[in-house]
Amino acid sequence: MRFDILTLFPEFFETPLRIGLVGKALQQGIAEVHCTNPRDFATDKHRRVDDEPYGGGVGMVLKPEPFFAAVASLPRLDPCEIILLTPQGQPLNQALLQELAQKAQLILLCGQYEGFDERIRQYLATREVSLGDFVLTGGEIPALALINGVVRLLPGTVGKVDSLKSESFQAGLLDYPQYTRPAEFQGHKVPPVLLSGDHQAIARWRLQQQLVRTWQRRPDLLAKRPLTAEEQQLLAEGLAEQHPGVNDVEK
């Protein structure tokens, strides 16, 4: 898979893309990342990529010409998405990462200043993506988050594929609690079921923990995911164990 990042600060990506699973994936050729500076495509002697907004206002707006020219210079793979990283975009979530991981190429447009000329949004980008309901100084951090989230889904990046299936958001639920040695630490013990060797009981406990944790922390996720009768029962039992007297779950 090929990532092309259009950024005024290509040096921002040098270290993060060399470390961890993403760094290994790039070394192994599972994915490749290329940075292009739109300033290299500015045509005036000062290599300006921004200008004052028409109609007045504070700040500077990124000009369309350098970004259109930079994108036109890139090799294209199919299917490709040209993604504008902006707070106005579609929220980045696991479902979107899974969709983007099916593409052959992602071109990421990183903004600065007051944002992009609207013609970049309308006639160049094919999608807008947001990291959340907050504003950063630029699109570089969202670009890194998107690359990290997509690359780890590519075949060969994560050693155990099953670990991807059970983690948070993959089934519309948060992940279950994880424990390792020692079995007791400062008086806090690992749940006995995890030491029992009963794989069916462990799977049931883990699903119950996912349901309870999601209900407590992200009820919005459960609103989007119909529960089976078994899951409703597991959730009710799990909540009753934590909060005696709770024996009904709103369906």
UniProtKB/Swiss-Prot annotation:
Q: Which GO terms describe its molecular function?
A: tRNA (guanine(37)-N1)-methyltransferase activity
- Record's keyword annotation contains Nucleus: no
Give the E.C. number(s): 2.1.1.228
Indicate where this protein is primarily found: cytoplasm
**Domain of life of the organism in this record?**
Bacteria
One Pfam family assigned to this protein is tRNA_m1G_MT
- Keyword terms, alphabetized: Cytoplasm, Methyltransferase, S-adenosyl-L-methionine, Transferase, tRNA processing
Q: InterPro entries this protein is in?
A: Alpha/beta_knot_MTases (IPR029028), tRNA_m1G_MeTrfase_C_sf (IPR023148), tRNA_m1G_MeTrfase_TrmD (IPR002649), tRNA_m1G_MTases_N (IPR029026), tRNA_MeTrfase_TRMD/TRM10 (IPR016009)
CDD domains, per database record: TrmD-like (cd18080)
Tell whether Phosphoprotein is among the UniProt keywords: no
| Gene Ontology cellular component list | cytosol
Location comes to: Cytoplasm
The residues the record assigns to binding S-adenosyl-L-methionine are G111, L131, G132, D133, F134, V135, L136
Q: What does this protein do?
A: Specifically methylates guanosine-37 in various tRNAs.
Q: How does it assemble?
A: Homodimer.
Q: Mind telling me which NCBIfam families this protein's record contains?
A: PRK00026.1 (NF000648), trmD (TIGR00088)
Its recorded name reads: tRNA (guanine-N(1)-)-methyltransferase
Organism of origin is Synechococcus sp. (strain JA-2-3B'a(2-13)) (Cyanobacteria bacterium Yellowstone B-Prime)
